[in-house]
Amino acid sequence: MSIQHAPVLTCTQLSWRHQGATILEGVDLQVRAGESLALVGPNGSGKSTLIKLLCGVLAASAGEVRLFGQPLSDYLRRDIAQRIAVVEQHSETLDAISVRDAVELGRTPWLSALAPWSAEDDRQVEQALQAVDLTHLSKRRWHSLSGGERQRAQIGRAMAQQPQILLLDEPTNHLDIQHQLSILGLVQRLPVTTVIALHDLNQALTCDRVAVLDKGRLIALGAPEEVLVPELLLQTFGVHAHYLVDPEDGSRLLRFRPAG
């Protein structure tokens, strides 16, 4: 994926506090147009909170988020949803609806009394279903889908929004390895700027850049192999790590062992 240098989403000294506890503190981050940015860190490091702040679901306690150079607080919710789509870990969806119904929900930000459902909305839904390879399952009921199929449908719903930025909060959690690889491959092929929170550091190696959070602070940012070095992994995750080279394709992979 080619990376342009213009930031599309920025945060400056971004902080969030809840019930007296500091969850995120002083985060400075620029997301570049066209890039894939991985957010990694131990449990409770602030990854999910940062994603909620970047899309306006949470309001910052201090600092600022800017979308295309304008304060996020200046945008209406509808305007944000036309630019940013979010795929959460656990998205609630009624079991009775079909796959197509779920994907059609992505058109909501574009509909109004003056702009009712049209052929263009049908076209966007069809494109989204094709992008996530669910056209053949479009009439299936939600309750009959596997975990991987549900997650693909959620990504399809997000793509039907026609976003320029896609935020994903650990989209491969609770999926088997086949579905993990399928979802990550799908995300990498999407023609949007992507910010993705991940637990698996080897998955983060496939992104353009990696941001490491620890105890609510951004402690490292850069190219994956420049950031995910043994010293940082020991300090942040409490594990020893070294790189291996895959003889099949020459790619580098992390191998871990317990510290101590």
What are these regions (language model features)?
Residues 160-164:
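A short, proline-enriched helix->beta-strand linker immediately N-terminal to the Walker B motif
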Residues 116, 141-145, 149:
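Conserved ABC ATPase signature
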